[in-house]
């Protein structure tokens, strides 16, 4: 199977988000997403209920583990039969060893950057590592922000925030930063 399953899982996440927000009991939504299809799915689902203020809370990238170069070397050795499955799993576990998005600038980290460019994150949160005091403060600030939007003079539901300017900002940011080409399928 190819990317058709990728879009299927994204759309399932979008539907689950839309159903969860459809109960008409919320004043706003704080959306927490990490990996490749989750964040686009949350965004699509939230836009189905564009009347709600929404703030996204990025996971941030996990700290550095085994380098991509070393991980690739072990994968190549495994493909050649030079190392066993245990060594491969050990390398994978060392590379992806903690909470957060992957350590490279792929789809998940591009998601975080694009949503910040669209104005859907607290500014400066896209690449703050999880688990630290700053991440905790920024998450609390996201909660205060969505509450402020729902109660304050600057009521801004997601359907008003995500307009053609926000989408252009996201695409320009994607191109300017060398973000993931997987976003072509999410933006079309």
Residue ranges and their predicted role:
Residues 1-8, 182-185:
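Anionic-ligand anchoring segments at beta-strand to alpha-helix junctions in alpha/beta enzyme folds, i.e.
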Residues 6-162, 166-169:
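Active-site cavity-forming subdomains of large catalytic enzyme subunits
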Residues 103-105, 176-182:
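Short helix-coil transition sites and intra-membrane helix breaks within transmembrane domains
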Residues 171-173:
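Flexible, glycine-rich loop/tail regions that form catalytic "lids" or insertion modules at the edges
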């Amino acid at each position: 199977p190819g990317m058709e399953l990728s879009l299927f899982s994204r759309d399932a996440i979008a539907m689950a988000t839309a159903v969860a927000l459809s109960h008409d009991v919320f004043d706003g939504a704080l959306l927490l997403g990490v990996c490749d299809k989750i964040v686009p799915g949350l965004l699509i689902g939230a836009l189905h209920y564009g009347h709600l203020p929404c703030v996204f809370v990025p996971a941030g990238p996990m700290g550095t583990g085994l380098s991509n170069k070393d991980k690739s070397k072990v994968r190549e050795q495994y493909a050649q039969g030079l190392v066993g499955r245990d060594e491969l799993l050990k390398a994978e576990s060392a590379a992806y060893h903690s909470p957060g998005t992957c350590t490279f600038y792929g789809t998940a980290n591009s998601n975080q950057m694009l949503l910040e460019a669209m104005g859907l994150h607290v500014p400066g949160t896209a690449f703050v590592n999880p688990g630290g005091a700053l991440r905790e403060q920024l998450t609390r600030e996201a909660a205060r922000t969505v509450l402020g939007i729902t109660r304050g003079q600057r009521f801004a539901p997601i359907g008003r925030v995500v307009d053609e300017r926000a989408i252009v900002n996201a695409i320009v940011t994607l191109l300017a930063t060398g973000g993931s080409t997987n976003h072509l399928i999410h933006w079309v």
